Amino acid sequence: IVSSALIYSAPLIFTGLGGTFSERSGIVNVGLEGTMVMGAFSAIVFNLNYADNLGKMTPWIALLVAGAVGIFFSIIHAVATINLRANHIVSGTVINMLAPALAVFLTKVLYEGKGQTAFIVQNFGKTSFPVLKDIPIIGQIFFTNTSAPAYAAIATALVCYFIIFKTTFGLRLRSVGEHPQA
């Protein structure tokens, strides 16, 4: 159960980390769900189109594509709230409402009127960590039949913690978020 929870929590961890940077900088981003939907949609489309060419690297590159699309939608939210002075909640709600509709529309356009895509060809699959899976009790819970992106998400969370709380950039980010005139 724990390994399945780790697998399914990876997208939420990555999205939560993006939201943490947004909140720490003083931008309330309620559009994270819409950002996640568009990232997932773009990753699936990428995977379906390039799986034959890229092979086993396809899911990892699709993960980067999903992150780039997520950054794009976050930039739209940032421009709307900072430059255009839109309300944070309204802008985020628009992204949350626009993203699923846009994903369904693009699915119908790209896949000839069908409301769904084909199954992805290349996925991350499940892995067991060779040495760590042999640890009594803990090895079976955390390191058997799990997915590598889950551990990449946890490692990214640790890196983000270091960036936010131990670097000059993080100090500036937090100070601007607490007091925008700083």
Residue spans of the language-model regions?
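Membrane-interfacial amphipathic/re-entrant helices at transmembrane-helix boundaries
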Residues: 1-16, 28, 42, 51-62
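Hydrophobic alpha-helical transmembrane segments
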Residues: 2-5, 34, 38, 60-68, ...
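Hydrophobic core segments of alpha-helical transmembrane domains in multi-pass membrane transport
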Residues: 15, 40-44, 100-104, 150-163
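Short, non-helical or kinked segments that cap or interrupt transmembrane helices
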Residues: 20-42, 82-95, 172
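Alpha-helical transmembrane segments within multi-pass membrane transporters and channels
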Residues: 53-100
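Mid-bilayer segments of alpha-helical transmembrane spans in multi-pass integral membrane proteins
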Residues: 75, 97-110, 123-137, 163
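Pore- or pathway-lining transmembrane helices of multi-pass membrane proteins that form conduits
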Residues: 83-111, 115-122, 153
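Alpha-helical transmembrane segments of multi-pass integral membrane proteins
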Residues: 133-174
